[in-house]
């Protein structure tokens, strides 16, 4: 099982790089800002996933139970990567919806970073802290989806409604996968001890969420499709 999960991680990394490159190429051709934000999102996500492997690749002699100092440094790196790709996706949403308010575009990202840091500083170390820390990512995703639904419900422009309805399948998929992200965190932080699964120390860590990987792969497919259409 560990063999499968390791190569699944490599696939996610490769897909992140390819999607990021495709979005950058499409941006250089079209100068559409949404493609620039997508490029940044998938680039940050590449590092977010790549840092998961650092324990085994850079520090193979470390015990499965990392020191609190090491976990703290890694957590702040996770804040950087998480904020990078989530805020970039939020800017994608704002661009697609035609949102012009700079304050609205900036505040969710600032709240995410501050809340993540507060959880690390205030909460006692343990599974509840890690669960809360990583669930903030899902909350930011749900904010994006909720904001998109609000804009759809409040617009009187039938053309705009029709344009947004074309993304309905992606919208539903993101809701379903977002709920699965939280469910996986509940399972592996609060219910099951990953160490009892016996499939390798890195396969299930505080920085792994396979539902999140699946969600991102869906986004990568859509982004690549749109980027290739721009380049065609």
Question: What are these model-derived regions, one by one?
Answer:
Residues 1-2, 59-69, 125-132, 193-200:
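Membrane-interface interhelical loops and short amphipathic "cap" helices
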Residues 1-5, 64-74, 91-102:
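Short juxtamembrane and helix-loop transition motifs at transmembrane-helix boundaries
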Residues 1-30, 131-156, 210-226:
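First transmembrane helix
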Residues 2-4, 67-80, 201-211:
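Short aromatic-rich membrane-water interface segments that cap or initiate transmembrane helices
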Residues 10-25, 34-62, 74-87, 110-119, ...:
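Hydrophobic alpha-helical transmembrane segments of multi-pass membrane proteins
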Residues 29-42, 100-109, 160-173, 231-232:
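Membrane-interfacial loop-to-transmembrane alpha-helix junctions, especially the N-terminal start
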Residues 82-87, 93-149:
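Membrane-proximal helix-loop-helix units in multi-pass membrane proteins
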Residues 146-156, 161-232:
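C-terminal transmembrane-bundle signature of multipass membrane proteins
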């Amino acid at each position: 099982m560990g063999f499968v999960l390791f190569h699944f991680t490599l696939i996610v990394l490769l897909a992140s790089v390819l999607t990021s490159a495709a979005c950058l190429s499409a941006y250089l051709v079209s100068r559409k800002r949404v493609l620039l934000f997508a490029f940044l999102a998938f680039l940050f996500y590449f590092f977010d996933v790549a840092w998961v492997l650092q324990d085994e690749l850079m520090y193979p002699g470390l015990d499965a139970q990392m020191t609190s100092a090491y976990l703290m440094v890694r957590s702040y790196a996770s804040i950087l990567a998480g904020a990078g790709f989530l805020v970039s996706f939020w800017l994608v949403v704002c661009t697609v919806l035609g949102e012009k308010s700079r304050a609205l575009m900036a505040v969710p990202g600032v709240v995410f970073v501050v809340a993540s840091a507060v959880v690390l500083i205030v909460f006692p170390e343990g599974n509840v802290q890690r669960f809360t820390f990583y669930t903030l990512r899902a909350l930011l995703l749900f904010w994006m989806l909720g904001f998109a639904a609000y804009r759809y419900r409040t617009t009187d422009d039938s053309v705009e409604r029709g344009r947004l309805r074309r993304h309905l399948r992606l919208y539903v998929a993101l809701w379903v996968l977002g709920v699965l992200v939280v469910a996986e965190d509940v399972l592996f932080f609060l219910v099951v001890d990953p160490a009892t699964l016996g499939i390798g120390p890195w396969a299930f860590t505080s920085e792994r969420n396979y539902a999140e990987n699946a969600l991102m792969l869906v986004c990568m497919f859509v982004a690549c499709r749109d980027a290739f259409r721009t380049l065609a």
